[in-house]
């Protein structure tokens, strides 16, 4: 698009014309610099959602957001495990527990997240209750990763310019592309990702962005609507490896995992969810353990790259995840993370 104005971009979207990555990067720059009005931000977000986002459009927006972010460099191969949220299922913190397990199994995890938006207890909320200092400055967050192979990037500290979109997003009160950019804008730019997405239409789009970046990833959605691999039914999985995307459906029964009920995975307030984390790390069997190990296995598979059979890869990684819990390594990992983050905070 030769002339970039809000009028031209929004008109194109309303006509059903897809924008280029440069167009949407320009739009995000206008938003993140505080130059866009609330009406322009809202109009753009709704027009894009109504047309349906493309890979190029989302890639441009994510790049524009990263251009305005506080980024960090964590040495070595890194992994993010996160869900977009928005499924309104109010489950326990599956991806948070899976992150701890994956790190205990040998991955270096850089988790990027925020407080609860659509649930009662977000990643930041439960980690804080467990004793992790969630708002370390970037240098200390990197140091914690180097020391214990897991760290947390509290989104508001790394994406301060996102405040300019807060009011129109809040007033719209419907999902837009902003709800899906978090997993694509981890400030550490991890080399692998395991991403749960509540909107099926966005799964392939987000997988396409990872493919264009050359990042190994698993993007998935429970066929019950969860933004994680579910154990209540099958899940849809988009496998990103070597710059290409392929789709598979996963049935946890093929791994010997019994069907769970939605109620068995439901969480509560921060006290309840923190207790669930502790019980899981202490080795409590049941549906929560099954779901967490499955998602940890997916994360470990993403970190290594899935080039062959998904089910066989997950089978091996599931055993690896189970061993990390049963040996006490996962519980020790959380304790080490708490200790390292608190030590850094005391130095401030």
UniProtKB/Swiss-Prot annotation:
Signal peptide: none annotated. It is an enzyme of class 2 (transferase). InterPro entries: Anthranilate_Pribosyl_Tfrase, Glycosyl_Trfase_fam3, Glycosyl_Trfase_fam3_N_dom, Glycosyl_Trfase_fam3_N_dom_sf, Nuc_phospho_transferase. 5-phospho-alpha-D-ribose 1-diphosphate binds at residues 83, 86-87, 91, 93-96, 111-119, 123. Mg(2+) 2 binds at residues 227-228. Its cofactor is Mg(2+). Pathway: Amino-acid biosynthesis; L-tryptophan biosynthesis; L-tryptophan from chorismate: step 2/5. It catalyses: N-(5-phospho-beta-D-ribosyl)anthranilate + diphosphate = 5-phospho-alpha-D-ribose 1-diphosphate + anthranilate. It holds the Pfam family Glycos_trans_3N. Gene3D superfamilies: Nucleoside phosphorylase/phosphoribosyltransferase catalytic domain, Transferase, Pyrimidine Nucleoside Phosphorylase, Chain C. PANTHER family: ANTHRANILATE PHOSPHORIBOSYLTRANSFERASE (PTHR43285:SF2). This is Anthranilate phosphoribosyltransferase. The lineage of its organism: Bacteria, Bacillati, Actinomycetota, Actinomycetes, Streptosporangiales. The gene is trpD.
